[in-house]
Amino acid sequence: MSRSLKKGPFCDEHLMKKVEELNKNDEKKIIKTWSRRSTIFPNFVGHTIAVHDGRKHVPVYITDDMVGHKLGEFVPTRTYKGHIKNEKTSKVRN
């Protein structure tokens, strides 16, 4: 479900302040954040933001194509290891 157009995009204030501070000083540091819900704005492009996936921070380099999406879209929270093959049934069939 998309957000109402009258509300506009959302970005956490602390994240926006950190990015603006780095842009003002022309620095490129990794920014740690737990805010997966924040929308990526054009002034984020070129920065690396470490987004929390529930157990660690995963670095994400922001490009032009990511503008308008949420930070959490680029960091999966679950790891799928596939279905475990049952060796007994495979031996019987062969």
Curated annotation (Swiss-Prot):
Gene3D superfamilies: 30s Ribosomal Protein S19, Chain A (3.30.860.10). Belongs to the universal ribosomal protein uS19 family. InterPro entries: Ribosomal_uS19, Ribosomal_uS19_bac-type, Ribosomal_uS19_CS, Ribosomal_uS19_SF. One of its GO terms (cellular component) is cytoplasm. Keywords: Ribonucleoprotein, Ribosomal protein, RNA-binding, rRNA-binding. GO terms for biological process: ribosomal small subunit assembly; translation. The keyword Kinase does not apply. GO terms for molecular function: rRNA binding; structural constituent of ribosome. This is Small ribosomal subunit protein uS19. Protein S19 forms a complex with S13 that binds strongly to the 16S ribosomal RNA. PROSITE patterns: RIBOSOMAL_S19. The keyword rRNA-binding applies. It comes from Finegoldia magna (strain ATCC 29328 / DSM 20472 / WAL 2508) (Peptostreptococcus magnus).
